[in-house]
Each structure stands twice: as structure tokens, then as C-alpha cells.
Amino acid sequence: MQQFIRLICLGCGNSDEPKNSLDIDDYVSFIIKFVEQQNIKELELIGHSNGGRIIIKLMNSKKLNFKVNRIVLIGSAGIVHKKSLSKKLKIRMFKISKKILSINILQNKFPNLLLKIKNCFGSVDYKTATPIMRETLVKLVNTDLKEYLPHINVPTLLIWGTDDKETPISDALAMEKLIPDSGLVKVQNCSHYVFLEEPIYVNRVIRFFLNGENK
């Protein structure tokens, strides 16, 4: 009998916030520890966005006490893009603003100004995150996993919305090229949250990939 476990990592959803900021290896260790504690010997892994990023790194772990048969990556993060000129300028402006507003006199006079500036520059996730999770997000988004993709040695299904702006379809094409035994399913006119926009179709594709069920 198959069992499905939905695992929410530290700092995500309603889970507890970590005491310190985490990096990709911390999340991988968290997953491995959980699987071992549950005494799971074989499993399939499904990850969306950062969940996919964690799976990519986990699949490159030297020694696992369990067997991963297949993986599904949905709009997976993990490929770092070169920053555009406008993005570089924004980062530069933010660093200058941060330096200026670190002066005590200005901090006392404008206590919330730096926070407002941060909110102008960050992504939606960054804006809504706590300070610890903001540090975590910075670590994660700057971790490029391209070099790990060719070492994934299990059948891999990639599911992507063609209109994904967070992890563009070009990322999916790159992963399909780099992961040896992989296939890409493009879902037309869907965003980063393709599994919410086309849940029945996505579920059917995953079931067929994992079990050969076409229902």
C-alpha cells in the first residue's frame, strides 16, 4: 500500500521558524533525517520550486540509507541566472542606501525607512519573510545547482507552466538537457503554480509516471 507524505520544511508554511538562517545543505539534512526516522527504505520524491532545489542537491548526496526510485520536479528552482544591468543597478542602489541608513543619526530619525527600501527591492517571498528567512532566501537563490544535474541517476519528470516567471521554461529545457534520464511536460498558459491551475492534469501525469496509471 502506497503512502503519501507532505513534508513542510522549517520556515515554510505553518512550520516553526529556524533559530538561524539555513542553506541548501541544511534542508537536505532535514529531509534525510526525516526519512531515516520514519524508517523508509524506498520512496519517490516530488518537489515544487525550492522543494525541487532540495531534491536536486539530495540526489547528489554521497551515502543515503534509502533508495529513491524516481523524482518529480515541478517548476523547480536551482539554476542561477546572470543578473541583468537593471538588476545590478537595483542591488547597487540598495547597498548604498543600506550603508547610508546605517548611520546612527539617520537610524534614529528614520527607523522604518530601511525596511521600506528593502520591500521595494525584494521579491514577494522576500518582502513577506522574517529577517531569518530573508537570510535563508538569499542563500538559497544564490546557490547554482547546474553542476549537480548530470549526476541525477534516476528517472526524472519535469512539469512546467509555459508562462512561469519565477523559474522560466528555459530552466526546464536546461534541466531536461542536463539530467540524463528526464522528460519534460509543458503545461500551456500556466504559471509557477501549474499544479494549482491544472491540478487534475498534473495529478494524472504524475500518477502515470510513478505507477503507470492513466486515471
Regions found by a protein language model. Name each.
Residues E44, N69-V72, P150:
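Residue in the alpha/beta-hydrolase core beta-strand immediately N-terminal to the catalytic nucleophile
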Residues S84, K99-N153:
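Conserved alpha/beta-hydrolase catalytic His-Asp/Glu region
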Residues E176-Y193:
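Catalytic histidine neighborhood in serine/cysteine hydrolases
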Residues I5-I46, N203-R204:
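Active-site loop/oxyanion-hole signature of alpha/beta-hydrolase fold enzymes
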Residues R53-S61, F66-S102:
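Flexible "cap/lid" loop of the alpha/beta hydrolase fold
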Residues C190-N203:
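Catalytic histidine-centered segment of alpha/beta-hydrolase-like enzymes
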Residues K165-D171:
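Conserved alpha/beta-hydrolase "acid-adjacent" motif
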